[in-house]
């Protein structure tokens, strides 16, 4: 039996080659892999010797040869194929182990297009596809994680059809992801990310028990190992809905750098948020906004969950806690709670991936766009439209209100006071209804809105929301502006003695 090993990621390849040698396999190899194997005492044969054809064009042509692809592709149970192989001196290659040139890593490391082009693998994908096509006769290995299992099955002679087929699927996933990555990069570089095709490729992290509802299948996929590197379960398993809520929580809790922010999320929308001096103070303040909706919600903690904070959270039922880090003592607080799920990123503060693009499935396709980021410049460059100036504390609250509004489903209005969200109206079909809903909820919970800052993620089309805000004592309003009736809104703010600021940037979220 003969194996061809040619890898860019050389982790575990020496041990894998030695394991094959112990099973009396002959080893073929190329370039850097060959040199490493020889240095480690593996009796490898260089592919150029096997093909009697040298590497050419600075290594661009190594394995693109009939003796390589014929050795991989000919069917062992087809008499015509076997005869042709014998006629042309083609010997079988029964295992192909390949991982591809590090294209992604190269694009991160350099902007030199010539170097990037040289890190587009040609021979590797060709071998992978050849071996995958002939998977009944050839084992195709594209993942370091499969080395031990393959050696085990070869020893036990249990490399059956189903196992080979599973490796074939992985191989085509591997080459498809690789080519998609290259195409996306070229479109990002030369077409602003909006070429004639866009590929969305993720790697499975885990299956969820079900999807959004019990009759739907579901799973979590990741880009660039984000969850592999930044998500660890300490208690319980994340559901599909948990992950969408965690996403909303992370977007909000990471919007204030290393500030001790706490976000409480329900159905991907905030029902509590605060930035106080400590995480405990932030949680207590966030919970006051809507303690009823917080029941069964997701709590995101931009810092370490300690025992004191854990005891406070444990006073109500929350389904999920996601924290930058979790103390052992804090984890013990929840030992008796069977339903709570606790996850950590094992970081000092929470992090998010900051993907550059965003997409939404629509029936028959998807819409694709640049990611909407709330930039600090929006607040730094906002224009005062009213006669009255905001105070320093009001401007701090305006920053919080603006970011919360921008990350909440439209139509949305947010009321913030002393660093905490105290009322919110969201996902409404009219902006004035969102304003009314927020005020009504605050009254129901006996929350005093006087002195609040009001934010809206899009312009107020009429002055009615400003009039409503004035009745509950709002002192400052921040919105994008851009309505044909902006003058009426400005006039209303001046009438009520409010400060009014326009950011000039809309943040619809659907």
From Swiss-Prot:
EC number of this enzyme: 2.1.2.3, 3.5.4.10
GO cellular component terms listed in the entry, alphabetical order: cytosol
Pfam families for this protein: AICARFT_IMPCHas (PF01808), MGS (PF02142)
InterPro entries given in the database record: AICAR_Tfase_dup_dom_sf (IPR024051), Cytidine_deaminase-like (IPR016193), MGS-like_dom (IPR011607), MGS-like_dom_sf (IPR036914), PurH-like (IPR002695)
Keywords of this entry: Hydrolase, Multifunctional enzyme, Purine biosynthesis, Transferase
Biological or metabolic pathway of the protein: Purine metabolism; IMP biosynthesis via de novo pathway; 5-formamido-1-(5-phospho-D-ribosyl)imidazole-4-carboxamide from 5-amino-1-(5-phospho-D-ribosyl)imidazole-4-carboxamide (10-formyl THF route): step 1/1; Purine metabolism; IMP biosynthesis via de novo pathway; IMP from 5-formamido-1-(5-phospho-D-ribosyl)imidazole-4-carboxamide: step 1/1
The MGS-like domain, residue ranges: 1-142
Reaction catalyzed: (6R)-10-formyltetrahydrofolate + 5-amino-1-(5-phospho-beta-D-ribosyl)imidazole-4-carboxamide = 5-formamido-1-(5-phospho-D-ribosyl)imidazole-4-carboxamide + (6S)-5,6,7,8-tetrahydrofolate; IMP + H2O = 5-formamido-1-(5-phospho-D-ribosyl)imidazole-4-carboxamide
A GO BP annotation: 'de novo' IMP biosynthetic process
SUPFAM superfamilies, per the entry: Cytidine deaminase-like, Methylglyoxal synthase-like
An annotated Gene Ontology molecular function: phosphoribosylaminoimidazolecarboxamide formyltransferase activity
Database matches in NCBIfam families: PRK00881.1, purH
UniProt family annotation: Belongs to the PurH family.
Comment block on domains: The IMP cyclohydrolase activity resides in the N-terminal region.
Protein name stated in the entry: Bifunctional purine biosynthesis protein PurH
Annotated organism of origin: Campylobacter concisus (strain 13826)
């Amino acid at each position: 039996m003969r194996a061809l090993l040619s890898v860019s990621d050389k982790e575990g390849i020496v041990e894998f080659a030695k394991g094959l040698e112990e099973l009396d396999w002959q080893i073929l190899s190329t370039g850097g892999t060959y040199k490493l194997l020889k240095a480690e005492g593996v009796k490898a044969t260089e592919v150029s010797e096997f093909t009697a054809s040298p590497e050419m064009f600075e290594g661009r042509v190594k394995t693109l040869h009939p003796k390589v692809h014929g050795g991989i592709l000919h069917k062992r149970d087809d008499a015509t194929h076997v005869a042709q192989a014998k006629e042309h001196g083609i010997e079988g290659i029964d295992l192909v182990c390949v991982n591809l040139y590090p294209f992604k890593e190269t694009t991160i490391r350099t902007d030199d297009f010539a170097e990037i082009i040289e890190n587009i693998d040609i021979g590797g994908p060709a071998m992978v596809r050849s071996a995958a096509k002939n998977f009944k006769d050839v084992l195709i290995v594209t993942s370091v994680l499969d080395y031990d299992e393959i050696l085990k099955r070869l020893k036990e002679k249990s490399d059956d059809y189903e196992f080979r087929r599973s490796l074939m699927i992985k191989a085509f996933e591997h080459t498809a992801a690789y080519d998609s990555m290259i195409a996306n990069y070229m479109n990002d570089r030369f077409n602003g990310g909006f070429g004639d095709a866009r590929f969305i490729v993720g790697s499975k992290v885990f299956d969820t028990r079900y999807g959004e509802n019990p009759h739907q299948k579901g799973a979590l996929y990741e880009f660039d190992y984000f969850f592999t590197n930044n998500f660890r379960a300490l208690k319980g398993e994340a559901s599909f809905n948990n992950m969408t809520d965690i996403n909303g929580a992370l977007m909000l809790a990471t919007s204030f750098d290393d500030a001790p922010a706490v976000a409480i999320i329900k159905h991907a929308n905030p029902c509590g948020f605060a930035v106080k001096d400590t995480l405990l103070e932030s949680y207590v303040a966030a919970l006051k906004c809507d303690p009823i909706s917080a029941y069964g919600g997701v709590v995101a903690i931009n810092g370490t969950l300690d025992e004191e904070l854990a005891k406070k959270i444990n006073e109500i039922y929350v389904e999920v806690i996601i924290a930058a880090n979790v103390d052992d003592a804090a984890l013990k607080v929840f030992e008796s709670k069977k339903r709570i799920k606790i996850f950590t990123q094992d970081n000092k503060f929470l992090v998010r991936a900051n993907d550059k693009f965003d997409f939404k499935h629509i029936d028959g396709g998807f819409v694709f766009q640049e990611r909407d980021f709330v930039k600090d410049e929006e607040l730094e460059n906002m224009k005062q439209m009213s006669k009255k100036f905001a105070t320093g504390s009001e401007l701090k609250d305006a920053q919080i209100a603006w970011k919360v509004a921008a990350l909440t489903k439209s139509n949305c209005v947010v009321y913030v006071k002393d660093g905490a969200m105290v009322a919110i109206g969201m996902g409404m079909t009219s902006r004035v209804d969102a304003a009314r809903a927020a005020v009504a909820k605050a009254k129901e919970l006996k929350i005093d809105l006087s002195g609040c800052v009001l934010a809206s993620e899009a312009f107020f089309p009429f002055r009615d929301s400003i009039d409503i805000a004035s009745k509950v004592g709002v002192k400052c309003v921040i919105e994008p502006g851009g309505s044909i009736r902006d003058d009426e809104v400005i006039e209303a703010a001046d009438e009520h003695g409010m400060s009014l600021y326009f950011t000039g940037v809309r943040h619809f979220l659907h």
